[in-house]
UniProtKB/Swiss-Prot annotation:
Region (Disordered) location: 601-635
Function field: Acts as a chaperone.
HAMAP family given in the database record: DnaK (MF_00332)
Cited PROSITE patterns: HSP70_1, HSP70_2, HSP70_3
Name of the protein this chain belongs to: Chaperone protein DnaK
Keywords from the UniProt entry: ATP-binding, Chaperone, Nucleotide-binding, Phosphoprotein, Stress response
Leader sequence segment: none
Inducers of expression: By stress conditions e.g. heat shock.
Entry similarity comment: Belongs to the heat shock protein 70 family.
CDD domains linked: ASKHA_NBD_HSP70_DnaK-like
Organism encoding this protein: Vibrio cholerae serotype O1 (strain ATCC 39315 / El Tor Inaba N16961)
Family annotation (SUPFAM superfamilies): Actin-like ATPase domain, Heat shock protein 70kD (HSP70), C-terminal subdomain, Heat shock protein 70kD (HSP70), peptide-binding domain
Length: 635
């Protein structure tokens, strides 16, 4: 069996790792970096991923997609999506099924389809390192992701050509990376994970019994729409407002300026983690009738902290809930681990330290720990890692809607997965022949305030007074945290089963279509690359031939020169087209036309060689004089 790689599919950056022998190793990408920006750009005839996509964002803001993880598995009408629509430079659109999709280059795409481009880059990075095809992966998700978001992440893996062996929670993966090589004793750790777009807290117990380590998640909580992107947006809004005060121009209407501002804001935020003050200096940010305008604004660390204080505070509430759910106090926590790039901010570290009453560990790389943990889990599933048992939990309660619009829970939040639960329900009316099973996820008593995961009908129930039929509903939650539901009429034995797919989400047919499109794009990308290579060869050939014509001078007969010029012009024309075979043919034609020129160039080279030989021979004829010292007294 091939390697199972571990992928941290992040909002801002992604990372891939693999077990190298018995040690997990983070793999550098083609640009030599250990993390890859989760940025995808669509240009004319090409899809760019990572740093190349990020570099051209300023000139192509509408077709450069970032922070797509904030949309994955979400409905267009979601409050969070509506907030993002106002601040994203690219178009977020409503799909036919009500999901939030994006539009680039006039094409509508599902979030999993776009995320698949990042996963493909991770897959290729691993394949280049391993020297063999990779088909299986463990992909991480925020612990607080719901069923639809987990399913959408699995879909992205499938579209990228990966069999997703396991979906694992990010804090759990970080705990695996941290706890695997720690010796001795049981410990209870808190993993505070503040990434680019999501926030999680997990309380995890690591037990060691006779050499076997058990990682048991006691509780988890979080906010799937809180992260570094929100911190960036606070900085962007501040800079825009300051510029408007100073110059009277609102940059929000200028996508190009906003893209430059986004980069500058992120850079300033990062600099303020180590410096007390930084300058945001953007010349020619915009222009009006009076001429070009420049931005030069000083930002202090204190100002940034004031801008984001409520965001940091917002992350502390889930900590209290997670501790209460685990039935623990802060004194029971042995180690605090920080994960996610945003935890490099001193204010975040200070607030977390104050909350837990202890300094967070500094021996965990916040950008790489999650991918490393995913690679370890890949090793566990492949049988390469023994003596490790991982017990994860479901972040939210699962149940069905019952009479009066009430949610009746079948599986409580923080239940260890995989798990199974069943409950017998009945009909609400006399002679009811069908029941609708409406599956929900969330903590509210009122069904309407919880996330609807989908619904299905169980039909063919025998007529009977209400309350008589016995309908058994079974919830089966797998190790990926994805739910399978069945309902059975105990009298007739009729059964209906579904794997939960929300009213949104991608159907198998849509995923298959996207897989095929990805394959077709692979072929198109290959053709594009071959065409680019052919054009480069044509350019080199034209340049070399023109250079030789100049060097040959009068030695090249006029008719030969005319023949070559015609061949060059034909190659120039072919080079502008899309036909590689035509370019190759015209390259051959130019080589044939330049035959005489090649001969002249060769003769000239030989003549030069001969001249050089003669001059060195002349130098060889010079005899070194022999000096003899003569004493004066011998004169």
């Amino acid at each position: 069996m091939g390697k199972i790689i571990g992928i941290d599919l992040g909002t801002t950056n992604s990372c891939v790792a693999v077990l190298d022998g018995d040690k997990p190793r983070v793999i550098e990408n083609a640009e030599g970096e250990r993390t890859t920006p989760s940025v995808i750009a669509y240009t004319d005839g090409e899809t760019l991923v990572g740093q190349p996509a990020k570099r051209q964002a300023v000139t192509n803001p509408q077709n450069t997609l970032f922070a797509i993880k904030r949309l994955i598995g979400r409905r267009f009408e979601d409050e969070e999506v509506q907030r993002d629509i106002k601040i994203m430079p690219y178009k977020i659109v409503k799909a036919d099924n009500g999901d939030a999709w994006v539009e680039a280059k006039g094409q509508k795409m599902a979030a999993p389809q776009v995320s698949a481009e990042v996963l493909k880059k991770m897959k290729k990075t691993a394949e280049d390192f391993l020297g063999e095809p990779v088909t299986a992966a463990v992909i991480t998700v925020p612990a607080y992701f719901n069923d639809a978001q987990r399913q959408a992440t699995k879909d992205a893996g499938r579209i990228a050509g990966l069999e997703v062996k396991r979906i694992i929670n990010e804090p759990t993966a970080a705990a695996l990376a941290y706890g695997l090589d720690k010796q001795g004793g049981d410990r209870t750790i808190a993993v505070y994970d503040l990434g680019g777009g999501t926030f999680d807290i997990s309380i995890i117990e690591i037990d060691e019994v006779e050499g076997e380590k058990t990682f048991e998640v006691l509780s988890t909580n979080g906010d799937t729409h809180l992260g570094g992107e929100d911190f960036d947006n606070r900085m962007i809004n501040y800079l825009v407002d300051e510029f408007k005060k100073d110059q009277g121009i609102d940059l929000r209407n200028d996508p190009l300026a906003m893209q430059r501002l986004k980069e500058a804001a992120e850079k300033a935020k990062i600099e303020l983690s180590s410096a007390q003050q930084t300058d945001v200096n953007l010349p020619y940010i915009t222009a009006d009738a009076t001429g070009p305008k420049h931005m030069n604004i000083k930002v202090t660390r204190a100002k940034l902290e004031a801008l984001v204080e409520d965001l940091v505070q917002r992350s502390l509430e889930p900590l209290k809930v997670a501790l209460a759910d685990a039935d623990l106090s802060v004194n029971d926590i042995t180690d605090v681990i920080l994960v996610g790039g945003q935890t490099r901010m001193p204010m975040v570290q200070k607030k977390v330290a104050e909350f837990f009453g202890k300094e967070p560990r500094k021996d965990v790389n916040p950008d790489e720990a999650v991918a490393v943990g995913a690679a370890v889990q890949g090793g566990v599933l492949a049988g390469e890692v023994k003596d490790v048992l991982l017990l994860d939990v479901t972040p939210l309660s699962l149940g069905i809607e019952t009479m009066g619009g009430v949610m009746t829970k079948l599986i409580e939040k923080n239940t260890t997965i995989p798990t199974k639960a069943n409950q017998v329900f009945s009909t609400a009316e006399d002679n009811q022949s069908a029941v609708t099973i409406h599956v929900l996820q969330g903590e509210r008593k009122q069904a309407m305030y919880n996330k609807s995961l989908g619904q299905f009908n169980l039909e063919g129930i025998n007529p009977a007074p209400r309350g008589m039929p016995q309908i058994e509903v079974i919830f089966d939650l797998d190790a990926d945290g994805i739910l399978h539901v069945s309902a059975k009429d105990k009298q007739t034995g009729k059964e209906q089963k579904i794997t939960i797919q929300a009213s949104g989400g991608l159907s198998d047919a849509e995923i298959e279509k996207m897989v095929q499109e990805a394959e077709a794009n692979k072929e198109a990308d290959k053709k594009f690359e071959e065409l680019a290579t052919a054009r480069n060869q044509a350019d080199q050939m034209i340049h070399a031939t023109r250079k030789q014509i100049t060097e040959a001078g009068e030695a090249l007969p006029a008719d030969e020169k005319a023949k070559i010029e015609t061949a060059i012009n034909e190659l120039e024309t072919a080079k502008k087209g899309e036909d590689k075979a035509e370019i190759d043919a015209k390259v051959q034609a130019l080589m044939a036309a330049a035959q005489k020129l090649m001969e002249i160039a060769q003769q000239q080279a030989q003549a030069q060689g001969a001249n050089a030989g003669q001059s060195s021979a002349k130098e060889d004829d010079v005899v070194d004089a022999e000096f003899e010292e003569v004493n004066d007294d011998k004169k």
